[in-house]
Regions:
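N-terminal export signals
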Residues: 2-3, 9-29
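Short beta-strand/loop motif that positions the catalytic acidic residue
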Residues: 251, 257-259
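Conserved alpha/beta-hydrolase "acid-adjacent" motif
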Residues: 264-270
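Conserved HGGG/HGGXW glycine-rich cap/lid loop of the alpha/beta-hydrolase fold
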Residues: 46-101
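Active-site loop/oxyanion-hole signature of alpha/beta-hydrolase fold enzymes
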Residues: 83, 90-134, 296, 304
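Conserved hydrolase catalytic core segment
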Residues: 126-165
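Catalytic active-site module of serine/aspartate enzymes centered on a nucleophile-bearing elbow/loop
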Residues: 282-312
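Conserved alpha/beta-hydrolase catalytic His-Asp/Glu region
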Residues: 162-174, 184-249
Length: 312
């Protein structure tokens, strides 16, 4: 750096500082005090972060993220539905993202209760709930038990219901050893595991000829690492061993089930193909060749189908 450049930079800095002191005190006052995030306190005192955009009198669309991510996973869909005139809401599940990293309560009953508390706090009525993967299980558990008038419709994308893990009653499910492997990998090196998942099966980037998005991989890792290891560890049991059979049977509202046919994380035969048979008012649409994270890799396609369902 030359002496002349140094003098110029000093003068620029001095000018900026002088300009700051000429700002109205009302503007400066806006920056005083701690910055706060939008949160609600649930019935057990857990702080849940949420985003709430759009007209408060518009129909709400509530987005439920997958494991181990956050509400940010729905940014594309939130902006899309916002542009279509909806009120859009996304929360970070307890222990995930910006929500409180509590030690306990990482199970579907607590997840659904947190959603109920959020819906009550924001006075959400006639809402459309859209859930991906673990978030689809959360939607099923919540909608099946929701207060009258709260829910209009639901959509399950690459969702885990009715139940993932193999058992005597679910012999073609995913072996428990697979989920034990998830837990071991997370405990050993969560940062590396959270790179391996999105760069491999989650978006289908391990398939020959796949168009890999480095941005999606990094964003998945960013979201995952912002949450708590305890919540993520316990959450594996929540999404793999929870049985949603009775929840699906109890739902009376219209439900759209969307699933990628090349989903390597939540195989379609053990999820969507079974779930649709349990729903009273369900519609199934599948996508040849698409992966578990299909709404992120093909947002225009999925957004159009979700919007058509919302308007139907």
């Amino acid at each position: 750096m030359t002496p002349d450049l140094t003098r110029r930079e000093i003068l620029k800095g001095a000018t900026a500082a002088a300009a700051l002191f000429t700002l109205p005190t009302s503007i400066l006052a806006q920056t005083e005090g701690p910055l706060t995030m939008a949160t609600i306190s649930t019935r057990d005192g857990t702080e849940i972060f949420y985003k709430d955009w759009g007209p408060k009198d518009a129909q709400p669309v509530v987005f439920h993220h997958g494991w181990p991510l956050s509400g940010d996973d729905w940014d594309n869909q939130m902006l899309f539905f916002l542009g279509e005139g909806y009120r859009v809401i996304a929360h970070d599940r307890r222990g995930h993202g910006r929500s409180q990293q509590v030690s306990d309560g990482h199970d579907m009953d607590h997840y659904a209760a947190d959603v109920a508390d959020l819906a009550r706090a924001l006075d959400l009525r006639d809402a459309i709930h859209i859930g991906h993967s673990t978030g689809g299980g959360e939607v099923a558990r919540y909608v099946a038990n929701a207060e009258p008038g709260r829910v209009a419709k639901a959509a399950l994308l690459g969702a885990v219901p009715p139940i993932m893990v193999a058992s005597e009653t679910n012999p073609d499910g995913v072996p428990l050893e697979v989920f034990d492997g998830f837990r071991a990998a997370l405990a050993a090196n969560r940062a590396q595991f959270f790179l391996d998942v999105p760069s491999g099966p989650f978006y289908g980037f391990n398939r020959e000829g796949a168009e890999v998005s480095e941005g999606l991989i990094r964003n998945w890792w960013r979201q995952g690492m912002s949450g708590g290891a305890k919540a993520h560890y316990d959450g594996i049991r929540a999404f793999s061993e929870t049985d949603f059979t009775e929840d699906l049977k109890a739902i009376t509202q219209p439900v759209l089930v969307l699933h990628g046919e090349d989903d390597q994380v939540v195989p379609i035969d053990n999820s969507a193909h079974k779930a649709i048979k349990l729903l009273r008012n369900g519609t199934l649409k599948t996508y040849p060749g698409l992966s578990h994270g299909f709404f992120a890799t093909h947002p225009d396609l999925i957004n159009a189908d979700l919007l058509a369902f919302a308007r139907s």
